[in-house]
Regions:
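Thiol-based oxidoreductase modules, predominantly thioredoxin-like and allied folds used
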Residues: 1-2, 21-23, 40, 44-59
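A generic structural signal for short coil/turn motifs at secondary-structure boundaries
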Residues: 26-28, 61, 82-84
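Non-catalytic, surface beta->alpha helical segment in thiol-disulfide oxidoreductase systems
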Residues: 73-107
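Hydrophobic beta-strand anchors of alpha/beta hydrolase catalytic cores
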Residues: 17-19, 49, 72
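Local sequence-structure signature of Cys/Sec-based thiol-disulfide redox active-site neighborhoods
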Residues: 2-41
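Structural micro-motif
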Residues: 15, 64-76
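CheY-like receiver
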Residues: 8-9, 60-63, 96
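Short, glycine/charged-enriched secondary-structure capping and boundary segments
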Residues: 32-35, 64-67, 87-89
């Protein structure tokens, strides 16, 4: 049996992590990837975007209780601060992320 070693994800404490649970459909993956490219360009180092493929990491999908794909989960210092199921448009996604990040920094 082959052992696969994974490198830990090391993220500075001030950086939030956006977990994006991607669907199997290639068409939807392309749409999600384009959306995430724009989000990454807008938010830069404020958010680290990590795609989670349900086929490759089913245990991660289960651990977060994801029922619908795509799903977006925003984490700050290991705590979930926001979740969205389905595909939002860019303006809505940016507004929601920005609001949650601002709220999280005011704790």
């Amino acid at each position: 049996m082959e052992t696969i070693l994974f490198q830990p994800l090391i993220v500075p404490a001030k950086t939030a992590v956006l977990l994006v649970f991607v669907p199997d459909s290639l068409t939807q993956q392309i749409v999600v990837n384009r959306l995430l490219e724009r989000v990454g360009a807008e938010l830069g180092d404020v958010v680290r975007i990590t795609r989670v493929d349900q086929v490759v990491h089913p245990e991660v999908v289960r651990s977060f209780g994801v029922q619908q794909l795509p799903s977006f989960i925003l984490l700050r210092q290991g705590a979930e601060i926001w979740r969205h199921n389905g595909l939002p448009d860019l303006a809505d996604l940016m507004r929601l992320l920005t609001e949650r990040l601002q709220e999280a920094t005011n704790w």
